[in-house]
Amino acid sequence: MDHKGFKAIDSLRKTRIIYPIIVGCGFILYMLYKEFDPSIFSNISFGWNSIFWLVIAILLMLMRDIGYVIRLKILSDGEISWLKSIKVVFLWEFASAITPSAIGGTSVAIIFVHKAGLNIGKSAAVVMATSLLDELYFIIFFPLLFIFVSPHLLFDVEKYSSNILLNSFYWFAVVGYCIKLIWVLLLGYGLFINPVGLRKTILFVFKLPFLRRWKKNAYNAGADIIFSSRALRKKPFIFWFKSFLATAVSWTSRYWVVNTLFLAFFIVHDHFIIFARQLVMWIMMLLSPTPGGSGFAEFIFKEFLFDFINTDPENMLSYAVGLAFLWRLISYYPYLIIGAIIFPRWLRDNFNKSTK
């Protein structure tokens, strides 16, 4: 592959794979050193119950990926095969894992979808629709939480102010939610009201250094972008219902992973509150400047969920640190590993031909 082709996917270079691993593992090691007491785990019996719930946690992550694959099939009108859809999902998650949470892998995902068989215009429309559905999940469910869970239960974490207006977690969530809401409004406007404006936005994105190789293609695909956006507007209600249902299954499965990790070691009663706090956690993680939320995610987990650990108060933080590491081990690091394996081959298959 020539230098120009490599530069186009420079955002996924090896150093960006290593960086989140160093940050995440470094923060975990720091927490282990400061707050972890391995002797307390001698009182935990690791038996078939633990194995069962850990297997369920892994299956829930698989369910999450299956939901994403089904959604991609729906949004692409079945033009992308099942195998290619699976590859795109894992490549997309890999890109998200090595970029800051606020950025995600959206820009590069357009290339992944395009190389799976769609034109650039339709690829952009599919990726934008995917982003819209993801954010819509948070926009809808976050306000609904307050119907079933009081703000006191959501944000009243020990060591932090019980006054919600003085609680830093509350303001993290509010700012994150406002950012998501603004993005959904802009994206919805572009997809369903002003596709020409969406086209201009996509062209601006393709001026980024690592996407500049496709700038000319993006200009030529202007008509495709407008056509695809109009096509999405004409989709029937059932199309969007199935797409959003797949989205909801994916995100909900991801959140239940933590519940199963708690069940593997403790007796848990407040499952819905744990689920609700995770949704809030992911909104707060939008503000993380680190790739994949590395470090910040572990910190939020430890601080935001430790009081649900059913053990002696003096041992809660030690258990929380261990669970935070196990959580990321199941829900984050596998995407780095899988992506690091399949990305080089994807690179060879899709770019070597253009250099011969």
Model-flagged regions — what are they?
Residues 84-88, 101, 106, 117-132, ...:
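Membrane-interface alpha-helices at helix entry/exit sites of multi-pass transporters
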Residues 1-90, 157-282, 311, 322-325, ...:
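Predominantly cytoplasmic-facing regulatory/coupling regions of multi-pass membrane proteins
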Residues 62-63, 98-101, 136, 248, ...:
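Hydrophobic/aromatic residues within the transmembrane alpha-helices of Major Facilitator Superfamily
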Residues 92-101, 279-298:
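Transmembrane alpha-helix interface/packing and boundary motifs in multi-pass membrane proteins
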Residues 112-122, 277, 281, 299-319:
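Interfacial segments of multi-pass membrane proteins
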Residues 95-99, 122-147, 178-182, 284, ...:
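Membrane-embedded alpha-helical segments of transport systems
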Residues 90-116, 216-226:
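Extended non-transmembrane interhelical loops and adjacent amphipathic helices
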Residues 142-159, 340:
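Transmembrane alpha-helix termini and helix-breaking/packing motifs in multi-pass membrane transporters
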